[in-house]
Amino acid sequence: MRVMAIDYGDQRIGIAVSDALCVLCGDAFTMQEWDMARAAKRIAGEVRARGVGTLVLGLPKNMDGSEGPRAELSREFAALLEAETGLKPVLWDERRSSVEAHAILHANGKKMKDHRKTVDAVAATLMLEGYLGTMK
C-alpha cells in the first residue's frame, strides 16, 4: 500500500505519492480546490485510484512548536479525510517545508513567479521523504 503526503493550503494542495514499495516518491502534483469538503472528496478518489494505505498530512507549527490557527484547519481537514477515506491521517510537523521547497526550486533555476505552481507539490514531497525515512 502506498503512502500519500498532503500539504494542505487554502487554494492549492500539494500531494506526493510513494511508489508501491514505499521507498521513493512516485508522483507529485498540485490540486487546486477552495472548498475543504470537496478537496477531501477529490483526495479520497486519488487514494482509492492509487491504492494508498497511509495518509500523511502536514501540520503547520510555529517555530517554538506551538500550534496556531493553520494547525486547527489542518486538524479539521484531517477529520474530513478520515471520514472520506477511512484512513486516519498521520499529522506531520511541516515546519520549514515550504521554505525548503522554495530553496529547492530556486536552486534548480525556477523563477519566483513560477514557484506558486509547484511549491506545494515539492513541500508534500519533502514531507513524504521524511515520513518514508522513519519507516526504514
Features from the language model and the residues they span:
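Phosphate- and other anionic-substrate recognition elements at nucleic-acid/protein interfaces
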Residues: 2-3, 10-136
